[in-house]
Curated annotation (Swiss-Prot):
Gene Ontology CC terms: cytoplasm; plasma membrane
The protein's name: High frequency lysogenization protein HflD homolog
Membrane topology qualifier: Peripheral membrane protein
Family: Belongs to the HflD family.
Biological classification of the source: Bacteria, Pseudomonadati, Pseudomonadota, Gammaproteobacteria, Pseudomonadales
This protein's record includes keyword Repeat: no
InterPro entries listed in its UniProt record: HflD, HflD-like_sf
Keywords (A to Z) from UniProt: Cell inner membrane, Cell membrane, Cytoplasm, Membrane
Disulfide bonds: none
Primary localization: cytoplasm
HAMAP family xrefs: HflD_protein (MF_00695)
Sections of the chain in a coiled coil: none
Amino acid sequence: MTPIQEQLIALGGVFQAAVLVDRIAKTGQVSEAALSCMLGSLLVVDPKDTLDVYGGDDLNLHEGYRAMASALERDPATLQREPLRYALSMLGLERQLAKRDDLLEIIGRRIPVIQSQVEHFGIAHENVIAATGALYEDTLSTLRQRIQVQGDMRNLQQPNNASKIRAILLAGIRSARLWRQVDGHRWQLVFSRRKLLKELYPLLHG
């Protein structure tokens, strides 16, 4: 796997999280497979490679790839505006989180607790989602920059949906951190668009 492919997979995780947040906000729906992939990515502590974080394949990242392609192509007809906004916000929040050792310590302490809940209840159980959402609220939500999610208030006001959104945002920020770890940089999204798209299309159609 090339370094750019590693970066695109991690960035695909960020955009996948963004797409799922947008879908829950607007429809109240999310597939269990997509949700499980995102939640599972938070629990992988020693991955062999980037794909390993998402369960060993990128089947559940394809919607993220599509949203990323629409952003890189800059075609107003296909651009997914809200997912793009969420993805860029997650990349920004990851930078703020990286400077906060106190918050990183809280996350590091509570992820194993969530892992034990997963072993007891299963990855997509409401207790796991609630615990993961609460972890986001206790850490990322305390930062100055906040992600404003737009959608149907009836969906956003349901506690289970709110927990899913926060849990997925935490997973998206985990993917943003992974992207940085494999040398992803925001300037690439501006200056290396064509190069990224050339490598992204085979992943998108694979």
